[in-house]
Amino acid sequence: MALAVTALAPPASAADGEVTFTNGGVTLHGTVVAPPGGTKLPGLVMVHGSGAHSREDYRDQAEAFARQGIATLIYDKRTEGYSQFERSYSTLADDALAAVAALRKRPEVDPARVGVWGLSEGGWVAPLAASRSADVAFVVTLGANGVEPSRQQAWAVENQLRRLGMDGSLVRMATSTMLRQLAAGGVFPEAHYDPVPVLKSLRQPVLGLWGAKDVLTPPGEAVEIFRSSLARYTLRVFPDAQHQLRRTSDGFDKLPGYAPGYLELVGTWVHDLPATSTADAPPPQDRPSAAVTPLRWYEPVWLQLAALVFLLAAFAWYPLFRRGPAARSARWLATTGLVTVLGFLAVDVVLQVTMGKALGPVVAGRPLPWLALQLLSLGTVAATIGTAVAWWRHRTPRLGVLLAGGVVFVPWAVYWGLLGV
């Protein structure tokens, strides 16, 4: 706990310097936190994790590094060209290199000893920046991945859903079917970015750090991939730490303070870059990550959208027209089919926004809304059979359109896990 107090205490011996730098026409603003009066200091540029971040998110660590004699640049992450649905690791890497160039010009900094530090998404970006420029003297990563972003996301989502007690078809839908569709539809930028070629190209020393209880990055796989890919490395695992190397009891909660030894390790390593490579044993994982494969020929995004529109139209169209005989099974099909499709869309939105936390109680591995949708799906199949009998007797276009909706519903529901265990 003493370490955490030191890391978060006011910077008794650190001075700030405002800097600006540009990349691709975008001006970025940052702060250099450094010990006052220092000369020939090593420098460190801190590269953000995913999402919107300002320099203040990393100030406590920058101040801790500055107290160890490291001039540390923190900056506000770009907002132009970066969002949930748009991002480029290449652009972010160039942002980091622009920050490196700005830090190397500082009078208190030794330009030959400036490196990059990257957390999470920054663990993809920082090595990419280093691979592009010899001006980057070293790389530090926290919670970095050795796998593609889509694969990491699937592993992390499954961890969260299983923690909530969920299992079965909903988990498969969220971690495979939905992610594959989002990636193919361009809604998951950089989904299939492969970090391994970049890691293999690095010649700078790399300090890779992971929490053994990380539930966002598969840490065991990451350690193994870094060890087999890098030329010069120091790989360390902190036993009671989570993704950001905060103290934790289970990987999900965040206790006060950083993992004991983390901040000091970065300081000593940066000041004395090791000539030889060392690595801790990979931490155990409950299960391995699985690749999020590209869509097959029969599951393109446009087909899923077309099926969705057709189902909504077929089920909603039937009750709008009262002409001709109305079978009870047809009324049930129109009702259950429409409610199931709309309910699925609602559940998926809640799932994406809250990572399953707002889906309510879980019964037999299924949250109640999903269980209700599965029961409605069975009812829709039964109503489709009854409607087929009614259509055979009456052969009306009204029943035919509705029956077509029921027929399309069956493979659609199987694909999305509504008719699955």
Where are these regions (language model features)?
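Short beta-strand element of the alpha/beta-hydrolase
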Residues: 40-49
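Alpha-helical transmembrane segments of integral membrane proteins
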Residues: 299-421
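Alpha/beta-hydrolase active-site loop
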Residues: 87-106
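Catalytic active-site module of serine/aspartate enzymes centered on a nucleophile-bearing elbow/loop
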Residues: 241-244, 250-303
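N-terminal cap/lid segment of alpha/beta-hydrolase-fold proteins
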Residues: 14-38
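Short beta-strand/loop motif that positions the catalytic acidic residue
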Residues: 202, 208-210, 214
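Conserved alpha/beta-hydrolase
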Residues: 64-82
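The serine-hydrolase catalytic nucleophile loop
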Residues: 51-62, 77, 220
